[in-house]
C-alpha cells in the first residue's frame, strides 16, 4: 500500500484539487454570506434544479418519478432513469441534509472520484502516470462547470470510466482464461446494469464500444466461441437487470399519453446525418490513430479504433435506423472523452517512437492535429465552462445581492413545510420560484417547463401553459413560438433543427433549389393555443385555474410586470391570503 501511494500519490492530490475547484463556488458563497446564509444554495449550471427536483421527488417517496414537478400523474410509469435520484435521496435522509446541501457536497466527491477512475483507465491503457494524470485532470478542467451539474455527467460518468476499464481488461488480459473473462464480463455487467438506470448516453456508449471491440478482437484472434462464452456472463446479468425496465416500458406504452410524449422526446424519422461537429471531431481522432498506430500494440489499436467508430455510430446511427435520439448533442462530452483517450494514445506512441528514434512525418502530423483539436475543443467547450465557473464573479468585491436575495426565500420554504399538506400544488408567478418549490419543499407547481418530459397529453400541457399565462398580455404567434420548448419540449425543435441540417446539405450539394424555410411550430398548433387563450379568458380565472389540481397561489408583489395583480387577487372570493413573506404573497385556494 505504501508503494502504491508512493507511485500514484500525486493523482490523489490532483483529484483533490479538481474536486476543490468544482465545490469552491458553493463554499465561497456560503462563507461570503456568513450569517446571511439561510440554506438556499446558489446554482452554477443549466439543468441543476431539474436534477435537484428529481432527487427531491425521490426523497418525498415518489420513486417512480412519474411526474416530478406536477401535481398530476404522480403514479405514472417512469420515463427518466430513477436510480441516481434514489441514491442521493437516500444519502440526504441518512445524513439529515437538504437536497441542495447533499449535492453541494457531491460537487467535491464525484469529481474527486472521477479523476481517479479516469486515471485508472488511462494508466491501465498506457502505463504512464504522466499521461494518465495529465489527461484525467485536463478533461475535468475543460468541463469544470459542466461537472458541477448533479447526476449527469457528474455522477453517471463514474460508471462510464469503469465500463471502459472493464472493456479494456476483457480485450487486453495477456493470460486470459475463461474464468477471468467471465469475471471481467460480470464486472462490466454490474456497471452496465447500474448506469442503465442512470443515463442513456452513457450505457449506449459503453454498449457501442464493447460491441465493436469484441467484434475486432474475434476477427483478429479467431476465438469466437471463447469470447462468446465470456459474453454470456455479461448478457445474462444485464438481461435480468433489464426486467424492471421492460415491465415499466409495458406500462409506459399502455398509457394513453404515450404517443404525445414519445413525439415530444424527439424520436423522429430522419435518415439525414446530424451532429456534424461531433462526427467531425471523432473523424479527426481517427486520422490521429492512423498517423501514430504503426507499431502499436494491436489491442490498444482495437480499443482506440472502437472508441472512434463508436463515436461515429452513436451520432450517425439514424442514417440507418431513422431514429434520432433526443438531445443528441449530449454525446459531445462522450466524444471529447474518446478524443482525450486518443490523444493519450498519440502521446504514448510518439514518446515511444522518440525513444526508439522512429519518429516520422506522420507522427508530427498527428501531434499538430492533436494540438489543433485541443485548441478548438478548449475554445468551444473549455472557455465557455470557465466563463460559466461562477467563482470568478463571486470573487468580485462589492454587491453580492445575487447571492443574498435568494436567502430571503428561506422564510417561504419554512412556511410551506410547516403549513401546507404534502404534495400541494402551487400556482407561482411574478417571483421566478419554479426552481424553489420543487427543490426546497415537498410541493409541486401548477405548470413547469419540464412537464413535457413526463407522461402527459399535449392538450394538458397546452391548457396549463395558457392558464399559467392567464395574466400575460399580447399572447400571439411569435410569443407561442418563443415558448414552444416550455409547452411541447423537443417535439418541434428537433424536427426543425434536422430540417435545417437537411436543407443545408441539399443546398450545398445543389440537389434541390428553392428550398422552403423550416417552420418551427406548425400553424395548427399555434391556432389551437390561441383558441385556448380566448376560451380560458372567457371562462374566467377561477374556473380556468380549477381545471387542474391547485392549492396555493404564490405572487411576488414587487414585480413590476405583475404590480396590479396583488390587489386583483385579494378581490377573488375563492382566494384567501394566508402569508406575506418578504413581499411574497401566499393565497390559499378555497374549494
Where are the regions a protein language model picked out?
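Start-transfer (signal-anchor) and selected internal transmembrane alpha helices
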Residues: 1-32, 182, 368
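Active-site lumenal/periplasmic loops and adjacent helix-entry segments of GT-C-fold
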Residues: 20-159, 200-204, 391-403
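Extracytoplasmic
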Residues: 55, 370-457
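Short hydrophobic alpha-helices at membrane interfaces in multi-pass membrane enzymes
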Residues: 166-193, 228-229
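Signature aromatic-anchored transmembrane alpha helix within multi-pass, membrane-resident enzymes
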Residues: 232-239, 350-387
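Luminal/periplasmic acceptor-recognition loop/helix of membrane-associated glycosyltransferases
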Residues: 444-552
Amino acid at each position: 500500500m505504501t508503494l502504491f501511494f508512493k507511485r500514484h500519490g500525486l493523482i490523489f492530490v490532483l483529484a483533490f484539487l479538481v474536486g476543490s475547484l468544482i465545490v469552491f463556488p458553493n463554499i465561497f458563497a456560503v462563507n461570503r454570506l456568513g450569517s446571511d446564509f439561510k440554506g438556499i444554495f446558489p446554482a452554477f449550471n443549466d439543468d441543476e434544479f431539474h436534477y435537484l427536483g428529481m432527487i427531491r421527488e425521490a426523497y418525498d417517496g415518489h420513486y417512480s418519478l412519474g411526474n416530478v414537478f406536477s401535481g398530476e400523474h404522480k403514479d405514472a410509469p417512469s420515463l427518466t432513469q430513477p436510480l441516481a435520484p434514489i441514491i442521493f435521496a437516500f444519502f440526504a435522509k441518512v445524513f439529515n441534509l437538504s437536497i441542495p446541501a447533499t449535492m453541494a457536497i457531491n460537487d467535491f466527491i464525484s469529481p474527486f472520484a472521477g479523476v481517479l477512475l479516469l486515471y485508472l483507465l488511462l494508466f491501465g491503457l498506457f502505463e504512464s502516470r504522466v499521461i494518465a494524470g495529465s489527461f484525467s485532470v485536463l478533461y475535468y478542467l475543460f468541463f469544470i462547470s459542466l461537472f458541477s451539474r448533479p447526476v449527469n455527467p457528474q455522477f453517471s460518468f463514474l460508471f462510464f470510466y469503469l465500463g471502459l476499464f472493464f472493456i479494456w481488461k476483457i480485450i487486453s488480459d495477456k493470460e486470459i482464461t475463461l474464468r477471468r473473462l467471465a469475471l471481467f464480463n460480470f464486472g462490466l455487467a454490474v456497471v452496465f446494469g447500474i448506469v442503465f438506470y442512470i443515463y442513456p448516453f452513457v450505457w449506449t456508449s459503453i454498449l457501442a464500444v464493447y460491441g465493436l471491440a469484441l467484434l475486432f478482437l474475434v476477427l483478429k484472434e479467431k476465438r469466437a466461441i471463447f469470447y462468446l462464452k465470456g459474453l454470456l456472463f455479461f448478457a445474462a446479468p444485464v438481461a435480468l437487470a433489464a426486467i424492471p425496465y421492460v415491465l415499466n416500458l409495458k406500462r409506459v406504452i399502455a398509457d394513453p399519453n404515450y404517443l404525445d410524449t414519445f413525439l415530444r422526446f424527439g424520436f423522429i424519422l430522419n435518415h439525414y446525418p446530424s451532429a456534424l461537429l461531433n462526427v467531425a471531431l471523432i473523424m479527426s481522432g481517427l486520422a490521429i490513430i492512423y498517423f501514430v498506430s504503426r507499431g502499436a500494440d494491436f489491442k490498444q489499436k482495437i480499443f482506440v479504433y472502437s472508441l472512434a467508430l463508436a463515436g461515429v455510430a452513436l451520432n450517425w446511427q439514424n442514417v440507418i435506423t431513422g431514429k434520432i435520439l433526443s438531445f443528441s448533442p449530449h454525446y459531445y462530452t462522450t466524444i471529447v472523452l474518446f478524443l482525450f483517450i486518443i490523444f493519450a494514445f498519440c502521446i504514448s506512441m510518439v514518446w515511444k517512437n522518440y525513444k526508439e528514434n522512429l519518429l516520422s512525418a506522420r507522427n508530427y502530423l498527428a501531434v499538430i492535429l492533436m494540438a489543433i483539436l485541443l485548441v478548438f475543443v478548449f475554445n468551444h467547450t473549455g472557455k465557455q465552462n470557465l466563463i460559466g465557473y461562477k467563482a470568478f464573479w463571486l470573487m468580485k468585491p462589492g454587491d453580492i445581492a445575487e447571492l443574498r436575495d435568494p436567502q430571503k426565500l428561506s422564510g417561504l420554504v419554512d412556511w410551506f413545510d410547516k403549513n401546507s399538506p404534502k404534495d400541494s400544488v402551487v400556482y407561482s408567478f411574478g417571483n421566478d420560484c419554479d426552481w424553489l418549490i420543487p427543490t426546497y419543499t415537498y410541493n409541486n407547481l401548477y405548470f413547469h417547463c419540464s412537464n413535457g418530459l413526463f407522461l402527459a397529453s399535449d392538450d394538458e400541457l397546452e391548457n396549463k401553459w395558457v392558464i399559467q399565462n392567464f395574466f400575460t398580455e399580447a399572447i400571439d404567434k411569435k410569443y407561442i413560438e418563443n415558448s414552444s420548448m416550455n409547452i411541447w419540449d423537443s417535439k418541434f425543435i428537433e424536427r426543425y433543427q434536422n430540417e435545417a441540417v437537411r436543407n443545408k446539405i441539399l443546398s450545398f450539394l445543389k440537389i434541390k433549389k428553392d428550398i422552403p424555410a423550416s417552420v418551427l411550430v406548425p400553424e395548427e398548433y399555434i391556432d389551437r393555443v390561441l383558441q385556448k387563450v380566448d376560451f380560458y379568458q372567457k371562462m374566467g380565472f377561477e374556473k380556468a385555474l380549477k381545471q387542474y389540481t391547485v392549492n396555493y397561489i404564490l405572487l411576488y408583489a414587487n414585480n413590476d410586470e405583475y404590480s396590479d395583480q396583488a390587489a386583483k387577487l385579494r378581490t377573488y372570493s375563492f382566494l384567501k391570503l394566508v402569508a406575506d413573506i418578504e413581499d411574497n404573497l401566499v393565497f390559499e385556494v378555497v374549494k
